[in-house]
Amino acid sequence: MKKDIHPAYQQIDVHCVCGNKFKTGSTNKEIRVEVCSDCHPFYTGKQKSVEKGGRVEKFKKKFGM
């Protein structure tokens, strides 16, 4: 096997938009995520809608149904 061809694996910080930070291992220098275990509805028990509306809702709105 060739030496020194693999990227360096290191401890990095992961930043969520909710403000949570945690460490993990990666070849990247930093990772930013939109949803983590502190703000995901499954883990928090709070349901929030991330869907703005599908095709059916747009059709009903357009034709007044």
UniProtKB/Swiss-Prot annotation:
PROSITE patterns assigned: RIBOSOMAL_L31
One Gene Ontology CC term in the entry: ribonucleoprotein complex
Source superkingdom: Bacteria
One of the GO biological process terms: translation
Pfam families: Ribosomal_L31
Gene Ontology terms, MF aspect: metal ion binding; rRNA binding; structural constituent of ribosome
Cofactor(s) needed by this chain: Zn(2+)
Family: Belongs to the bacterial ribosomal protein bL31 family. Type A subfamily.
Role description: Binds the 23S rRNA.
Name of this protein: Large ribosomal subunit protein bL31
Organism listed in the record: Alkaliphilus metalliredigens (strain QYMF)
Gene: rpmE
